[in-house]
């Protein structure tokens, strides 16, 4: 008997979803967006990205498959309706534990914070100590990785259309945190630092290469190899989404059909990690400024009090003037 993933309906509680996500390493959210919306995104991508630019020939995505990066630039519908989908952001808030929650907080809250407000940022996690000569030193302690905060906010790691075509083999199983290894190794009970989402822009079936995931593999040792009986496939209808954690083994399936299997992938990472895809070249200011403030913030056009700031620019929207810099 093969492994399986738990499927949730869109109106089920975030707590139930995230509890299962933490236990199993992956979940499916059925019918999270209208199927027609996914068709609109695909049409925008095809209109804005030439066929030649969609070709792929890499070990991860071999010749015959299709890929398109910078989805938020290729499709404003993707940026506004999928990337910042409220349910997805609620789950990301619960998994990545940001200080500034992204689903509920107004984008401009804190933008005009005073110096005194900024001086208390992270209160309880730091103190100013003095030596005998009255020189002062800032001393930090780590936050609880299970309670947070684990970052100020989170950003888009990468956004890519991943299309499986006929005649390729199963993609090698891999973990999303592999892009940061060996620099960030596996530590038991470490902070979660990548959350991935794959939207089904077509139906995902076993025959057309539905994403393969290994439940509970996020708890395994690095050298444990998954048996076929331990691998589940994210079989789901168009408009559904599968989400998984940084250490969950996964990979595209093999398609035995002539039809395309199109997924729209994006990941979220803490603001203190380097983004996998360079968002500022992929989605430059002249494109980003046409998007909503929340989309801009998730893409990366925002800063914390310590990271990513630009003097003279607003921390919650770096494309406009403001006073968000610490100096």
What spans do the regions from the language model cover?
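Catalytic core of non-heme Fe(II) oxygenases with the double-stranded beta-helix
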Residues: 140-152, 163-235, 273-283
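Aromatic-acidic/polar surface patches that form glycan- and anion
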Residues: 34, 80-85, 190, 228, ...
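Short hydrophobic-aromatic micro-motifs
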Residues: 29, 197, 242-244
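A structural signal for short, well-ordered beta-strand segments
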Residues: 158-161, 197-199, 264-268
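Non-heme Fe(II)-dependent double-stranded beta-helix
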Residues: 2-23, 30-179
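Conserved double-stranded beta-helix
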Residues: 220-243, 247-249, 253-327
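Catalytic palm active-site di-aspartate
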Residues: 25-26, 239
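A structural signal for well-ordered alpha-helical segments within the folded catalytic domains
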Residues: 86-90, 195, 237
């Amino acid at each position: 008997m093969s492994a399986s993933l738990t499927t949730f309906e869109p109106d089920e509680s975030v707590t139930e979803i995230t509890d299962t996500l933490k236990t199993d390493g992956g979940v499916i959210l059925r019918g999270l967006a209208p199927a027609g919306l996914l068709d609109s995104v695909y049409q925008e991508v095809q209109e804005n990205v030439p066929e030649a630019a969609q070709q792929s020939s890499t070990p991860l995505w071999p010749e015959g498959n299709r890929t398109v990066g910078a989805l938020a630039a290729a499709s404003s519908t993707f940026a506004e309706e999928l990337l910042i989908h409220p349910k997805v952001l609620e789950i990301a808030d619960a998994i990545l534990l940001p200080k500034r929650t992204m689903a509920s907080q107004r984008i401009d809250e804190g933008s005009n914070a005073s110096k005194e407000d900024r001086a208390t940022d992270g209160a309880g996690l730091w103190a100013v100590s003095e030596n005998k000569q009255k020189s002062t030193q800032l001393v930090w302690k780590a936050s609880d990785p299970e309670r947070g905060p684990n970052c100020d906010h989170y950003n888009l790691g990468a956004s890519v259309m991943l299309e499986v075509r006929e005649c390729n083999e199963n993609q090698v199983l891999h973990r999303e945190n592999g892009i940061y290894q060996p620099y960030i190794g596996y530590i038991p009970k470490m902070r979660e630092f990548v959350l991935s989402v794959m939207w089904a822009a077509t139906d995902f079936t076993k025959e057309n290469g539905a994403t393969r995931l290994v439940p509970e593999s996020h708890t395994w040792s690095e050298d444990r190899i998954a048996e076929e009986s331990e691998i589940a496939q994210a079989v789901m209808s168009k408009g559904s989404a599968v989400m998984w954690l940084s250490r969950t083994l996964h990979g595209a399936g093999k398609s035995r059909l002539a039809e395309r299997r199109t997924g729209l992938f994006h990941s979220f990472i803490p603001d203190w990690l380097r983004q996998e895809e360079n968002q500022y070249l992929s989605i430059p200011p002249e494109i980003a400024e046409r998007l909503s403030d929340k989309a801009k913030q998730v893409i990366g056009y925002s800063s914390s009090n310590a990271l990513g700031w630009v003097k003279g620019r607003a921390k919650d929207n770096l494309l406009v003037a403001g006073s968000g810099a610490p100096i």
